[in-house]
Amino acid sequence: MATASEERAAADVLKSLARHLNCLNEDNKIARKRALEALKRETVEQRLSGGALQELFGGLLKALLKCLSDPAETCRDTAIQILTGFIRAVPRPEDSLPYLMPALAQRLGGKEILEPAEELRLALMETLSLVLEVCGRQLAPYLEDMIKILQRTITDPFPEVKKESCKCVISVAQSIPDHFHLQAESLLKPLLQTISHQHSQVRVSVTQATGAVIQHSTGKNVDDVLSHLAQRLFDDSPRVRKAVTVVVGDWLLRLPDRYSYFHKLIPLLLSSLSDEIPEIRTLAEDLWKKIGSQWEKENEDDLKDKMDFRLPAPALYTSGVERPGLGCRELVVRNLSKLLPAVGRDIGDWLVQTRVKTAQLLRVLLLHAEDHCTQHLQSLLTVLYHACADPETDVRAQCLESAKLLGAFVSAEVYLKLLLPHVEDFTSCSSASPWAPLTVLGAILRGSSREALQPHLIKIGDTLAHPEVCQGSQQALYLDQLLVCVDAVLCVCQVDCAVISLQLLKVLVSVQSLASQQEQRNKAEESVRCLCEAQGLSGACELYRQHMADLLQWLSDSHHTWTSHSIQKTQLEIIAMQSGPVVGEFLPALLPLLKSCLEPSRDPEMRLHIFTMLSKLLLDASNTLDSQGGFAEYMEMVLQDLLLPNLVWRSGRSAAAVRTAALSCLLAVLHGAVLSVEETLSTQLISALEEDSKLARLLACRSLHSLLKLTTQRLNTDSLNKIYPELLKRVDDSSEDVRVEALKSLSTWFSCLGKNYDTQSCRPHLEFLFQQLLLYMDDPDTKIQDLRLPIILCQCVLVHSHTQYCSETLHTP
């Protein structure tokens, strides 16, 4: 109550202001403006006592509120300033509420906002904030007016008004919570309409206001709000994400019905644990610890045994990561069955950022669930199959980390029972990517311990070496994941891998056979070296020596079905080439396999591939097939069973290519072997001189050349007389290389004319030969003239001393 002196002072001031009050009704806005400024000077700007100001405020309030509707913006502005000054200074501002609140509601809370000036709307909202601050609970009777105002101003076009409105929402909720919950829900619609505003600070304010509304409401609208808050976790502004984290954390700590919403709120807070901003991560960690501790205290009776006998962290617990508290872990475990379906749905969302956030959340959930993951393993594997095939690198990386956690927390026997059938037949799982189960297997193996995997190594090795797995696809991604699985087993189990050395080698050979990229083949070869190191072997040769018999038997089991499309032919090549000298130790097993594959009735393209491999081996025979010096024992078999049957002429381009390849092998044999089948061989080579292929004719000439060198003076007269006419034909060949090689072969042919060659009876042959050779002395190609003809003639003279033939031939017209 004002004292008598304060009342007199107020009355005196009011008398002095009577003229100014009358001027407020003037038509001239300047006069009204001056009157308001005079009121301001004589009241709120004077150092009057609180009681006197209270009396003045009561006397001037209606006039000032009327000025809020003044046509002049400057007058309305001054009136608001005077009102604000009185509210801040008077001891009982609540006395003004019966008139002030309806006036504000009329100005701001109607269907149409009457105040056109955005700065004045902001000033009015600041006045309302001040009223909430100084009046508090005494505003309860005016809640409806405030709700009307806020419903309109939250969606105001002016961002500053939006922010001030959100501030008022929080103040109302905290000032009169007992009444606010009755009307709180009516504010959610305008708030959610504004939560995606372009200004980040507006989004922050709306998020905070939404948190207050839900906190002090009946809690029925949490579901309506969650999706909007979840979207704000992807906000580009760290301040917005921080606000969401604080709001959700506060709900988990204080929301009256929070237990009903744990499964919906926990994912939002845990998502912030993976935020890119350290401050937000730290904030989320602190809130999560508080939530876990509070829940632990609230449920002490249920957790008594676990609290009294706390189990240590799993042995393979992620290094550098603090283990969550018991309360946090239990909260996740008890809600995991409700969380995983949503995770499985969102991991396939069309938005990349949603998939990344979900993948990060999955890892955090598994870190909390620990061995409780086991009961959800099937659904977890399904989620991981999809996620590990995601085109986004971040999604795949997070899911691989999740798979490693499964390896650390789940028994190997359990996850292998579910996972290996999917590896053998990827169509049995829901993934469209054949490499997805392999990807998950590789990551889980990486997360497992050596002791856990050791009893199951044979099962793992057999699965990886199964034809449907190691030969299941030529896709680069599939082969990469096969290598990842092999490397994971080698890395974790090390020397224990000796029991599945053969299976792993089969996988690595298969990868090299299917790989279309040299980089993949190099990786596979590196894995072979790692396999050797794991067993203490000196190199790949030792590894192949250990398993060559089994590898050849592995290939022999299916060789009758090989075609040009069979991977086995390439596997054979890799084994033979990479084993080096070891292949020479297993000729009894290798050559029958080659014989079967090179039968003329088999696929021509497949035979061509085998001949190409054989040619490479023969060219380096001392370090491959003949490394033990025993290849000569099998030479006749090689010629009779492998080469000669394939030199027989057959129609078709494929058959011609096979004959060319066989000639290439024959030439390699002739370069380093002694033969006992020269008669048969020379017949086949003579036939090959007529091939359509230039390369085949060239190889045939070279082979005859080598054969003549190897069988010097051992060929009978008939064989020699059959050879030279065919060589003479090749001197007229369209290919210069073939002509040159034919002349070289003829030169060697002369050296084969030993004592058994009857020059008298064969005189017509010699005369014909010399006559034909002399024709080439005038060949337009000087290389042909100069190359071998003089040498041939001289050899005839020196070796056989039949000068009369030379002289007669030279003088024959």
Annotate each language-model stretch with its function:
Residues 1-813:
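Extended, low-complexity, acidic/polar intrinsically disordered regions
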